């Protein structure tokens, strides 16, 4: 329990929606705990430090799913010594030092890979407690921060990855990836589908265009899924792509087995009411799917963390990878015509999921911060030349 005034600084990043969603889940949970002595602040470090360059990098990141896959692949799978020579390791350093001296946090929580934090812990000898929430299912070197006291990871396999990389087992907690508590709540599937003017007796296929709406060819997929699985119905989530939503609505306006939606706050209800989901394997989306025990098909996952997530889920029997739309259509047909296989996949997910991840993480964070040093003890160790960066 926090009995003295304490402050948590959350460092996150807006490359995709997942890291921000994790941050918001944690902030919401801490706020619900009504801790009068605790303040929580969050910063999108890279965007605040270098807004123009980061905006360019974000556009490149989004487009990398379509045009620059090999470039991103080389970056993601580069060796640690190559990263050490890269400017990325020092990206945001001045801003981070400025934040630490200005805010004087009692604990730093990372919800985004932040290699620059390693520079502080290794070169500046700052010993503020650091905790990291990893938002994917396979470990990557960018998530490791020397002298970090806690890593919150998705599975025991992820923990083993960190141990193999040299992180002490006692620093790693298997909590699952934090998602909103509503994904733990019971949903009346029949009532929800009826409210949405869909048939509760039909298998429902949930399709998502992804956070950036970068995928195309959904009209072809929907037509062929219904042709090969005529007893099914399809719910298509277009995200923020208004053009995709408008196009698909026009094409399927007279088909009662197809529902086209834009951005929705009801992914929880749709996941709980569907038998199968076609999606990109972002860490948060598949964690929500795991919580709802809905088998998934990963369509042409991008090299890097998403492909590693897809490999992991496929190896565990939670989903299948489809390299092409036609392959995805065939997998849908096979699974919807084999109800027992879907049940087995859902059962494996039920056995493996870790519930109430956000609560577990917040409880442990409070324990960590309760044992943290006083700010005067910490900030007396900040080198004088570091103060040059304070604005």
UniProtKB/Swiss-Prot annotation:
Keyword field: Carbohydrate metabolism, Cell membrane, Glycosyltransferase, Lipid biosynthesis, Lipid metabolism, Membrane, Transferase
Swiss-Prot/TrEMBL GO biological process terms: enterobacterial common antigen biosynthetic process; glycolipid biosynthetic process; lipoteichoic acid biosynthetic process
Subcellular location per the Swiss-Prot or TrEMBL entry: Cell membrane
GO CC term (a single one): plasma membrane
InterPro entries (alphabetical): Diacylglyc_glucosyltr_N (IPR009695), Glyco_trans_28_C (IPR007235), Glycosyltransf_28_UgtP (IPR050519), Pro_diacylglycrl_glcsylTrfase (IPR023589)
Superkingdom in the source lineage: Bacteria
Pathway assigned to this chain's UniProt record: Glycolipid metabolism; diglucosyl-diacylglycerol biosynthesis
Catalytic reactions on record: a 1,2-diacyl-3-O-(beta-D-glucopyranosyl)-sn-glycerol + UDP-alpha-D-glucose = a 1,2-diacyl-3-O-(beta-D-Glc-(1->6)-beta-D-Glc)-sn-glycerol + UDP + H(+); a 1,2-diacyl-sn-glycerol + UDP-alpha-D-glucose = a 1,2-diacyl-3-O-(beta-D-glucopyranosyl)-sn-glycerol + UDP + H(+)
Sample GO molecular function, one term: 1,2-diacylglycerol 3-glucosyltransferase activity
Primary enzyme class: transferase
CDD domains tied to this protein: GT28_Beta-DGS-like
Entry keyword Chloroplast: no
Chief location category: membrane
Enzyme Commission designation: 2.4.1.315
Similarity comment: family membership: Belongs to the glycosyltransferase 28 family. UgtP subfamily.
Role description: Processive glucosyltransferase involved in the biosynthesis of both the bilayer- and non-bilayer-forming membrane glucolipids. Is able to successively transfer two glucosyl residues to diacylglycerol (DAG), thereby catalyzing the formation of beta-monoglucosyl-DAG (3-O-(beta-D-glucopyranosyl)-1,2-diacyl-sn-glycerol) and beta-diglucosyl-DAG (3-O-(beta-D-glucopyranosyl-beta-(1->6)-D-glucopyranosyl)-1,2-diacyl-sn-glycerol). Beta-diglucosyl-DAG is the predominant glycolipid found in Bacillales and is also used as a membrane anchor for lipoteichoic acid (LTA).
Protein name: Processive diacylglycerol beta-glucosyltransferase
Gene behind the chain: ugtP
């Amino acid at each position: 329990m926090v009995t003295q005034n304490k402050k948590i600084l959350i460092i996150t990043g807006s490359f995709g929606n997942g890291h921000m969603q994790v941050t918001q889940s944690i902030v919401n949970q801490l706020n619900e705990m009504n801790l009068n002595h605790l303040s929580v602040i969050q910063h999108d470090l890279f965007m605040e430090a270098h807004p123009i360059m980061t905006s360019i990098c974000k556009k490149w990141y989004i487009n990398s799913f379509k045009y620059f896959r090999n470039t991103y692949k080389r970056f993601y799978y580069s060796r640690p010594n190559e990263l050490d020579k890269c400017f990325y390791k020092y990206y945001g350093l001045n801003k981070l030092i400025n934040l630490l001296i200005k805010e004087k946090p009692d604990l730093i929580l990372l919800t985004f890979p932040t290699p620059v934090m390693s520079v502080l812990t290794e070169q500046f000898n700052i010993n503020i407690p650091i905790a990291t929430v990893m938002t994917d299912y396979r470990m990557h070197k960018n998530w490791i921060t020397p002298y970090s006291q806690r890593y919150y990871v998705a599975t025991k396999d992820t923990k083993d990855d960190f141990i193999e990389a040299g992180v002490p087992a006692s620093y790693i907690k298997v909590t699952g990836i934090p998602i909103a508590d509503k994904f733990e709540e019971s949903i009346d599937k029949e009532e929800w589908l009826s409210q949405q003017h869909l048939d509760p007796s039909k298998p429902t296929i949930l399709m998502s265009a992804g956070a950036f709406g970068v995928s195309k060819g959904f009209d072809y997929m929907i037509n062929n899924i219904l042709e090969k699985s005529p007893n099914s119905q399809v719910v298509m989530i277009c995200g923020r792509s208004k053009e995709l939503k408008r196009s698909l609505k026009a094409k399927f306006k007279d088909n009662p087995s197809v529902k086209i939606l834009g951005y929705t706050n009801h992914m929880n209800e749709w996941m709980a009411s569907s038998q199968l989901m076609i999606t990109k394997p972002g860490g948060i989306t598949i964690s929500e799917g795991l919580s709802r025990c809905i088998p998934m098909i990963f369509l042409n996952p991008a090299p890097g963390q998403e492909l590693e997530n897809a490999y992991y889920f496929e190896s565990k029997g939670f989903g299948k990878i489809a390299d092409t739309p036609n392959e995805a259509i065939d997998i849908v047909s096979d699974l919807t015509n084999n109800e027992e296989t879907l049940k087995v996949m859902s059962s494996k997910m039920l056995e493996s999921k870790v519930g109430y991840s956000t609560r577990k993480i917040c409880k442990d964070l409070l324990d960590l911060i309760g044992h943290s040093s006083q700010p005067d003890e910490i900030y007396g160790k900040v080198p004088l030349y570091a103060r040059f960066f304070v604005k």
